[in-house]
Swiss-Prot record:
Family, similarity comment: Belongs to the uroporphyrinogen decarboxylase family.
Compartment(s): Cytoplasm
A GO CC annotation given for this chain: cytosol
Stretches that traverse the bilayer: none
Protein name, entry field: Uroporphyrinogen decarboxylase
Gene Ontology annotations of biological process type: protoporphyrinogen IX biosynthetic process from glutamate
Taxonomic lineage from the root: Bacteria, Pseudomonadati, Pseudomonadota, Gammaproteobacteria, Aeromonadales
Record organism: Aeromonas salmonicida (strain A449)
Length: 355
């Protein structure tokens, strides 16, 4: 294995010394970049882009050519797992993801296969191997999956949702059906992430985008429990290094202590929580990733720098901070503003890391 030229991101996740705060952006390979749009046009559509290892590699590397980012993240989608289970993923123009065969009953859940990550999801592993090769040890590669709860919301609702009525109906009227679905999804995600690690991912992240729509008790029983199972089932050492695991529940700021108790290495934070408060609560147990509002990138460059400075000061001195947005970058952001953000993190953070 090539030694990493820049391991700042991995070191920060393990709360080890770094010379400056590492930074990457959720959805850093995406529609805000004109070069991404050009590559997607070549692919034809989103899933064709995901399924072509060379093109998925190209869009993964595009933001690294523009910005001095400290990590690359696999270009893929959280819905690859339910798609591999046979639900028939497709994308409606302007509507987002849909499933041809949503989950409606216990029989549907019982019939679901657990996908073989090197078979039905082999195209993802090919992308991981291709990206890892082309990175040439410059920065680490992040693999990822959706959380069981978040994947289940799409599978039961049949796509995106605002009210989550179908899955909440299942949760309250047929909890055993939902628990079986979540358990199968947890097993699928463990296999999927471990295959990504074996293929070359040096860190993994679980996106629990919709955990924040649950009551505290339901969050514990229907989301956190299954993320805990995933953390317990993951490969944590590979290529002579620890493989850090980050859990991110959007709107999950009230549950940081419980998430930190899963044994993960880092928590993702959205912008609705003060990072100083998060550090006070769980900074002795886990690293923190975040947490600038992605909409701040619409602001003037001076205002972006000011916000970066505020968040860095909130975390303060010491290790264990990976700077990121609190969610994905918006598609109509000026790429120059993203560059201001990345450069500001490096420039303004060195003072907090004494050498």
């Amino acid at each position: 294995m090539k030694e990493l030229k820049n391991d700042r991101y991995l070191r920060a996740l393990l709360r080890q010394d770094v010379d400056m705060t590492p930074v990457w952006m959720m959805r850093q390979a995406g529609r805000y970049l004109p070069e991404y749009k050009a590559t997607r046009a070549v692919a034809g559509d989103f899933m064709s882009l995901c399924r072509n290892a060379e093109l998925a590699c190209e869009v993964t590397l595009q933001p690294l050519r523009r910005y001095p980012l400290d990590a690359a993240i696999l270009f893929s989608d959280i819905l690859t797992v339910p798609d591999a289970m046979g639900l028939g993923l497709y994308f409606e123009q302007g509507e987002g993801p849909r499933f041809e065969r949503p989950i409606k009953s216990m029989a549907d859940v019982q019939a679901l296969p657990i996908p073989d990550p090197e078979d039905e999801l082999g195209y993802v592993m090919n992308a991981v191997r291709t990206i890892r090769r082309e990175l040439k040890g410059e920065v680490p590669l992040i693999g990822f999956s959706g959380s069981p709860w978040t994947l289940a919301t799409y599978m039961v609702e049949g796509g995106s949702s605002k009210a989550f009525t179908k899955i909440k109906q299942m949760m309250y009227a047929e909890p055993q059906t939902l628990h079986l679905l979540l358990d199968k999804l947890a097993d699928s995600v463990i296999g999927y992430l471990n295959a990504q690690i074996k293929a070359g991912a040096q860190s993994v992240m679980v996106f629990d985008t919709w955990g924040g729509v649950l009551t505290p008790r339901d969050y514990r029983d229907f989301s956190l429990q299954y993320m805990h199972k995933i953390v317990d089932g993951l490969i944590r050492e590979n290529e002579g290094r620890r493989v850090p695991v980050t859990l991110f529940t959007k709107n999950g700021g009230q549950w940081l202590e419980q998430i930190a108790a899963t044994g993960c290495d880092a928590l993702g934070l959205d912008w609705t929580i003060d990072i100083a408060d998060a550090k006070r609560r769980v900074g002795d147990k886990v690293a923190l990733q975040g947490n600038m509002d992605p909409s701040m990138l619409y602001a003037a460059p001076a205002r972006i720098r000011e916000e970066v400075a505020t968040i860095l000061a909130g975390f303060g001195s010491g290790n264990g901070h990976v700077f990121n947005l609190g969610h994905g970058i918006h598609q109509d952001v000026d790429p120059e503003h993203a560059g201001v953000f990345v450069n500001a993190v490096h420039e303004l953070s060195a003072q907090y890391h004494g050498r």
